[in-house]
């Protein structure tokens, strides 16, 4: 889901995560961006054409429609075609650093140079759907409350498909079981084998029950979006 590498903002006297309003969340994120600005390194030039020659390690899973992974539980691998390039680089970097715990992805990310990541990310960014079809379905009242509770649109943008920062993922249309597993991972802390380390997403995910996360994931998966699976046959 979201990858933010800004310094952790002091939480003294801060409201509980479930009480954070959309306005407060946006203000918090803007402060984080400002604090981090001095530590950011220049982005590498991205070459989508070069990336097309580097995706062999990706298509074995992400190029097969409906392909399932088994770690940490069975779920469809995420659709990455159409995802933002900066987010893809951010996610790969998190796997390489161990901030996202996944043995296969850490091995793959560890074998990639920064330039490889930039090129592969650029390639997948331009492989999304030409246009999202139709409007998002109206959520059930209970789901609408969950979306409000999580302040999802505050970061992931309109229809959860236009993130306010390119390092955040597009969510609309993503596989429900993947979203559920990813959200649960943010509830897992200080485990050397599973989980994801991200201060903002950890704070947002923890107040939800698994039943609520499943309902939220199912609705987000039903939303039209840019993401898709580019068939492996495309690369032969």
Short names for language-model regions:
Residues 23-31:
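Bacterial N-terminal signal peptides that target proteins for export
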Residues 8-24:
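Short, Lys/Arg-enriched N-terminal segments with co-localized hydrophobic residues
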Residues 65-96, 106-111, 145, 153, ...:
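Gly/Gly-Pro-rich "capping" loops immediately C-terminal to redox-active cysteine motifs
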């Amino acid at each position: 889901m979201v990858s933010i590498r800004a310094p952790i903002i002091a939480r003294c006297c801060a409201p509980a995560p479930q009480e954070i309003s959309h306005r407060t969340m946006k203000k918090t994120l803007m402060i984080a961006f400002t604090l981090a600005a001095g530590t950011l390194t220049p982005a590498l030039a991205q070459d989508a054409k070069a990336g097309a020659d580097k995706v062999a390690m990706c298509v074995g899973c992400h190029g097969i429609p409906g392909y399932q992974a088994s770690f940490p539980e069975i779920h469809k691998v995420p659709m990455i075609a159409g995802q933002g390039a900066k987010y893809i680089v951010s996610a790969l970097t998190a796997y390489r650093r161990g901030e996202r715990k996944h043995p296969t992805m850490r091995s793959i990310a560890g074998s990639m140079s920064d330039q490889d990541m930039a090129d592969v990310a650029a390639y997948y960014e331009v492989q999304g759907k030409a246009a999202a079809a139709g409007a998002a379905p109206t959520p059930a009242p209970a789901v609408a409350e969950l979306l409000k509770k999580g302040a999802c649109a505050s970061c992931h943008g309109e229809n959860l498909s236009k993130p306010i920062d390119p390092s955040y993922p597009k969510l609309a249309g993503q596989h429900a079981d993947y979203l559920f597993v990813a959200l649960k991972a943010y509830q897992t802390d200080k485990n050397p084998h599973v989980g994801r380390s991200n201060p903002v997403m950890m704070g947002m995910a923890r107040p939800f029950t698994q039943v609520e996360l499943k309902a939220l994931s199912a609705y987000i998966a039903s939303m039209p979006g840019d993401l898709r699976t580019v068939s492996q046959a495309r690369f032969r």
